[in-house]
Amino acid sequence: MIELFFEEKFKIFKSIEYALIQKLYEELIQVYINDGIVFTMGNGGGTSVANGFAVDLRTHPFTHEDKSVTTEVRRIRVIDLSESSGMITGIANDIGPESIYSEQLKNWFREDSVAQKNLMIAFSGSGNSKNIVNAIEMAKKYGVTTSCVSGRGGGAASKLVDIPIIVPGNSNFPGQTGKNDNNFHIEELQVSVGHILTGLLKGYVNQKGL
C-alpha cells in the first residue's frame, strides 16, 4: 500500500501544468515589486495549507542564512483569511459560513484597490465551496488576480479564477472516501505549490541582492 501511495503521487505530480505554477509565480513577483497584498484562504485541510503558506511566504524569502541574524529586506504583505478563528466563527454565526472570507475582504478593499496589484490564492478540495467562490467573486470586482489550487475538476472556482491549478486523477489509497477520493494527493500538491512559490521568491530576492 505504501508503494501505491507514492506511485499515485508521482503520476499525479507529473501531470500538473507547470506553466500555470510559473504564471502564478510571475504574478506573485509583481505583487512584491508593487507592494501589493497576497490573500490566502482554504477549507478543512486547505485551511492548514493556507496557514503554512502564509507563514512561509512572510518569512523564508527574507531570512538570513544564519536564522538568528535579522534582515531589513522589504517583505511581502500576506493576509491569511483563514487565520482568525474568532473572526471566522463570528461571521459564520452572525451572517453565515458562506461569508466567512468575503466579509473579511471588506476590511481591505477600497475603491482605489482596483489600481493596486493584489493576488488571491485559494486552496480547495473541490473548488465548489460557497465561501471560496464568494470571496473570489468579490476579489475580482476589485481587480485582484485570483488563483485556486483544487482537485476533482476544479469546480466553480476554476471557472472564475485567472489561474486555475487543478490536481488531476483519483486515488485508491485507503482513508479517502466518497467525493474526497483524491484528497491526500490534492493537499500534498497544494503544499508543494506553496513551497515552490516561496522558494522561487527567495531566489528572486537573493538574485536581486535585496
Please annotate each region the language model reported:
Residues 46-51, 128-135, 157:
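Short glycine/serine/threonine-rich phosphate/pyrophosphate-binding segments
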Residues 36-41, 115-127:
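A short, small-residue-rich loop immediately preceding and capping a beta-strand
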